[in-house]
Amino acid sequence: MTGLNGDDPDDYYLNLNQDEESLLRSRHSVGSGAPHRQGSLVRPERSRLNNPDNPHFYYAQKTQEQMNHLDVLPSSTGVNPNATRRSGSLRSKGSVRSKFSGRETDSYLLQDMNTTDKKASVKISDEGVAEDEFDKDGDVDNFEESSTQPINKSIKPLRKETNDTLSFWQMYCYFITFWAPAPILAFCGMPKKERQMAWREKVALISVILYIGAIVAFLTFGFTKTVCSSSKLRLKNNEVSTEFVVINGKAYELDTSSRSGIQDVEVDSDTLYGPWSDAGKDASFLFQNVNGNCHNLITPKSNSSIPHDDDNNLAWYFPCKLKNQDGSSKPNFTVENYAGWNCHTSKEDRDAFYGLKSKADVYFTWDGIKNSSRNLIVYNGDVLDLDLLDWLEKDDVDYPVVFDDLKTSNLQGYDLSLVLSNGHERKIARCLSEIIKVGEVDSKTVGCIASDVVLYVSLVFILSVVIIKFIIACYFRWTVARKQGAYIVDNKTMDKHTNDIEDWSNNIQTKAPLKEVDPHLRPKKYSKKSLGHKRASTFDLLKKHSSKMFQFNESVIDLDTSMSSSLQSSGSYRGMTTMTTQNAWKLSNENKAVHSRNPSTLLPTSSMFWNKATSSPVPGSSLIQSLDSTIIHPDIVQQPPLDFMPYGFPLIHTICFVTCYSEDEEGLRTTLDSLSTTDYPNSHKLLMVVCDGLIKGSGNDKTTPEIALGMMDDFVTPPDEVKPYSYVAVASGSKRHNMAKIYAGFYKYDDSTIPPENQQRVPIITIVKCGTPAEQGAAKPGNRGKRDSQIILMSFLEKITFDERMTQLEFQLLKNIWQITGLMADFYETVLMVDADTKVFPDALTHMVAEMVKDPLIMGLCGETKIANKAQSWVTAIQVFEYYISHHQAKAFESVFGSVTCLPGCFSMYRIKSPKGSDGYWVPVLANPDIVERYSDNVTNTLHKKNLLLLGEDRFLSSLMLKTFPKRKQVFVPKAACKTIAPDKFKVLLSQRRRWINSTVHNLFELVLIRDLCGTFCFSMQFVIGIELIGTMVLPLAICFTIYVIIFAIVSKPTPVITLVLLAIILGLPGLIVVITATRWSYLWWMCVYICALPIWNFVLPSYAYWKFDDFSWGDTRTIAGGNKKAQDENEGEFDHSKIKMRTWREFEREDILNRKEESDSFVA
């Protein structure tokens, strides 16, 4: 939704018509009414919100489900999933202002949904929903009723019913594998139909790769030979070697060694023989073309000594002499041995000569013709030497006068094909072509020209992509990167920062420079006895901590005087909008209202940072607006005042989300230490660790949850009293029901890894997926995968955003966040996703958050991942440059266009919701139903979906974000850095890259279908992604072609110069990027190591990955105690949804309040 001034931050992405400005101005309020558009720029078939393939299908469904308490305005493009707003249905893509007691409430205010007389609503917005269908008159079509039916959210529905009709792709899979019927596959270890189909799809995909490879190979090597099929060798004039002699412009092979003592050129059945002295010369006069086109043009004189007959047929025209091929020989009429010696006029010699096949054609270039010392002309492509007319036996023959005229007319270098055009002149020209031809003009056929066109067009495209990527990557490094993050720096300072990161990344144990923490902000030491004391009231807690932490007086700050100059009327601070600034603005207005009624009363400003930590400030309110304030931990990290901006931008609350599986204590400690000690204020960050099952990693003496809980202290609830709660897992069958425990407390440092003076008091929540009682005896109870861990958080954020019913686990998560931070979960705006073996640089989180705050269009970003064990083995050494170039060339290029296609799961940040303008409207991003529903899809019945969802879930999330929000940005921030341990064994690397390569292929296929990415046609990200997809699929063939070209260039002639230059540019520009962007010359060495390993990167790894298309395991990447045993079939059993309780958080809270009241009453009694 646009702001009050009609300025939409997304407008520059939209194709607006001339009337759009007035439309925008008319849509900024609830009462603006339904928009009227004159037309749609989106094709109708792409705007049907009842189509499950529409990127915003689930968003439209969600708004329909929640129409009783959500009110959503149209977007700036007039998008509206249900235009019949007056009948009670909602409008999509916008925001509303919540109504309660005649005042506007907070954004995402979670009010009682069961109250019928007072409607609670949520401010929410989205700019991504496709546009409605409009008829020719501009009227809005009604949304189809089939799409307005609510979805039963107690169970996430399967998105599509099974269809027995075979698709074209399935038919092709069966066709290409007709030779492998089901019984044979079952005999080979694939008894299940789904497994067999995966194998068939793998074979079909490999066949497609082979087709593409064959096309590329044909264009590279076969196309030229097909359309430019000149099988004969071409030799340039004066460069004919001594193994040949030239006869009438053609080169014939001369054998100089078989017959000793030979004195002249002799012709046998298929070979010319002659002495060494004749090699490399012009022997045209030894085999003269007589009595052809020159018959009756060249005639014998009456006293001619040349044998002739009555029909003017002559035996020869010129003396039968050899001459130099460069034309330097002078006429020689001396008779040797006898007249006609060496003229080869016998029938046997002539028949033998006519039977010879020339080995090559002699050619002249136009420059050579014009600049030659010889009198050369051209006729119909033949090069004629007029100087050879001086060799005519003038005493014995008569010839046309035109011969002398041509010779003396200074026609050198001209093409006389059109001049000699009438009948007699053409006969003369053909006669000259027979007797004085010395070669052909260097020319090409139409096929050869077409071949050159294809070659150079391909060359231009490839070089354009490579060079443009290089230039843009350099531009990003010099111009964009230094302006990103918390502060703008010059290139010198940027280099220093990069060097500091390089020094830090040389070893995983190397410590980063940490700031000393104020003693009041350090962790407190508690005895077990002190953990059970009674919670203080919210106001007492605020009063207790307000001055101690930030050294400001206990007196209440009046926002009307202290922030009025900075905080705009819409809740924006210097153009930057956050939940905190908007909440502060609203509470400031409430202060004004309350103070005007009772000057002695003023709402405590500090409460603005607690969101709904107190009951409604409006007297008489009976609605539950927040959780019970008495359960808040007494020593939570106090929220700073609104004007606390240590980095020059409003702070936003961030969840640092860590997923772990089988990591050891050192790896997990490394990650949590680095996150806890980042210089981003601990008041605005929350650590959240998810342990994926009761897993004991290989070599560990404790399970992963035990290790994680050992790093917590000062628990909200004693660990032995925490109960497991149910939730809907991303799985099939009985495993769809899972249980987890939630522990909340504060991070417990190890003084040996982080000195006490550098420790911050950071809240932490650990979620342990423990599984149902039925699976406690299994190998990996509770394990559902990393995607399920992410969905726990994402689904929770969606439920909070849309005020939906939630599971018990999600309510406990909400409750624990409230207890440990004093904040409702809707205050969090970003999520930093980190793997449990990653160490983050201290200022990384600050730079990432700063970029999010400064540009609300950014929905995701990543930093640079460094390898900490560079020289551990040859396996790690070959990865160093690959990591570097993937960031500083690929991601840098994509970042300039806001379309980074892969945000690595080990270190990336996503936006939960984004401010839409500065007037209180928000766009759910990571919490968007279209993201959550598609990412939590549990129906993986095709090879494509299995590779997307089971192997490359992190990359798929990035693709899903771009697919849902193609006009928003995903960027790369090199100022933010982390380091990790790369695989040091080849089998582990092989397993890791198998997953990465296969997920890359399938994700690129998803992205190449997105038509709304930046650019158009060849100048678009869609085209670049298409090129990357083809390039990835033909990597094994490409490296084979490269090796072939290099070997061919070494051993054969002519040298393929263009191909070698192209190869040098492709391999050389990354090296040049290192020289330009890197601050360490050592990367040149790592580049050399990488180039030597190209056969591994481009052949071994992708070939292995393609052959393992149907392998969906994680292989040797993560190992557990006892080995990676196969779990039971994921589809085993049925899902009993009755075991999962779904309620609103208010209903859960009301139940909790009653339970606590009963316990209190029973205790008193």
From Swiss-Prot:
Pfam families: Chitin_synth_2, CHS4. It comes from Saccharomyces cerevisiae (strain ATCC 204508 / S288c). Glycans are attached at N303, N332. Disruption phenotype: Decreases cell wall chitin level. Resistance to Calcofluor White (cell wall stressor). Decreases conjugation frequency. This is Chitin synthase 3. Keywords: Cell membrane, Cell wall biogenesis/degradation, Cytoplasmic vesicle, Glycoprotein, Glycosyltransferase, Isopeptide bond, Membrane, Phosphoprotein, Transferase, Transmembrane, Transmembrane helix, Ubl conjugation. It comes from the Eukaryota. The gene is CHS3. CDD domains: Chitin_synth_C (cd04190). The chain crosses the membrane at residues 171-191, 341-354, 453-473, 892-910, 1030-1050, 1056-1076.
